[in-house]
Amino acid sequence: MKRYILATAIASLVAAPAMALAAGSNILSVHILDQQTGKPAPGVEVVLEQKKDNGWTQLNTGHTDQDGRIKALWPEKAAAPGDYRVIFKTGQYFESKKLDTFFPEIPVEFHISKTNEHYHVPLLLSQYGYSTYRGS
């Protein structure tokens, strides 16, 4: 049992820097705060899409962690300048709390001009309103 615990501890120490590096080099992160509770919104699905000639193409999807964050939403492919959007699937979040919402999905469009910068999209959320901005 001691060997198992030691092996698990060593494995997590080895993996943690690699995961932090991956998140640190990723150009896109999101964060959701529930304004009604003042707490993070965990488990919310977020979809990343790129604008194309005839609509939108999905690039990636993820779920917010216990802190309401997705630290690395950009897919492994290289970033390119262009128009993108993240869609926060908030309907299921409120449904799980047995609350109604006016906004079951919140699409946030943004433009990437410099692929060597980090883009952070925070969402401040309530049942009947939201706000967002370019974070850091």
Swiss-Prot record:
InterPro entries named in the record: Hydroxyisourate_hydrolase, Thyroxine_BS, Transthyretin/HIU_hydrolase, Transthyretin/HIU_hydrolase_d, Transthyretin/HIU_hydrolase_sf, Transthyretin_CS
Residues noted as binding substrate in the record, renumbered to the chain: H31, R69, Y133
Domain of life: Bacteria
Main location: periplasm
Catalytic activity: 5-hydroxyisourate + H2O = 5-hydroxy-2-oxo-4-ureido-2,5-dihydro-1H-imidazole-5-carboxylate + H(+)
Keyword Signal in record: yes
GO biological process: purine nucleobase metabolic process
Assembly mode: Homotetramer.
GO molecular function: hydroxyisourate hydrolase activity
Described function: Catalyzes the hydrolysis of 5-hydroxyisourate (HIU) to 2-oxo-4-hydroxy-4-carboxy-5-ureidoimidazoline (OHCU).
Gene Ontology terms: cellular component: periplasmic space
UniProt-recorded name of the protein: 5-hydroxyisourate hydrolase
Catalytic EC class: hydrolase
Localisation: Periplasm
SUPFAM superfamilies the record matches: Transthyretin (synonym: prealbumin)
Annotated signal peptide: 1-20
EC number of this enzyme: 3.5.2.17
Keywords for this protein: Hydrolase, Periplasm, Purine metabolism, Signal
